[in-house]
């Protein structure tokens, strides 16, 4: 199966956000900051601390949220040439994944991928926990082709590791 695609900025930013929010360290950081903000609010209400402490925790939470939700995905999008290229991607049960651009091509065997994840707009093909490749779901010509690709990925990615 072969698909041709480029990237839509809005969808890529959403896919990158999904990746960041799925990271355990980001989730833990958000939980800790929320707990500290709630504790600071309670202590401020009970007059145990000054309200400025609650404002500081609120500002930290807001800044972290903006960083992970807006700034980090946008900076990666702007730095990466990948999102400006046009691709041809071939999925083959025997060969693996062949990616072609005007600058060259790369073939990955299925066992080069550690896992895959599906989000609203993309299939995320992970090489390891931090590096991945996004395959837009709208690049498939119809729902049946997308289901076939999903089945191929489920059967071949993460096996034999």
Q: Model-derived features: where do they sit?
A:
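N-terminal membrane-targeting/pre-transmembrane regions
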Residues: 1-38
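Short beta-strand segments
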Residues: 1-3, 106-108, 133
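Conserved beta-hairpin
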Residues: 66-107
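Generic beta-strand structural signal
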Residues: 91-93, 117-118, 127
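Phosphoinositide-dependent membrane-docking surfaces
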Residues: 97, 106-121
């Amino acid at each position: 199966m072969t698909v041709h695609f480029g990237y839509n900025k809005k969808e890529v930013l959403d896919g990158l956000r999904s990746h960041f929010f799925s990271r355990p360290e980001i989730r833990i950081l958000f939980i800790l900051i929320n707990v500290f903000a709630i504790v600071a609010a309670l202590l401020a209400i009970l007059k145990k601390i000054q309200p400025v402490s609650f404002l500081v925790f609120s500002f930290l939470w807001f800044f972290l949220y903006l960083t992970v939700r807006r700034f980090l995905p946008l900076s990666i999008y702007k730095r990466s040439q990948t999102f400006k290229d046009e691709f041809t991607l071939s999925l083959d049960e025997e060969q693996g994944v062949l990616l072609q651009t005007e600058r060259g091509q790369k073939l990955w065997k299925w066992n080069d991928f550690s896992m895959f994840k599906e989000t609203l707009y993309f299939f995320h093909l992970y090489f390891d926990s931090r590096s991945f490749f996004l395959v837009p779901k709208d690049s498939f010509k119809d729902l049946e082709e997308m289901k076939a690709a999903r089945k191929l990925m489920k059967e071949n990615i993460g096996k034999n590791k």
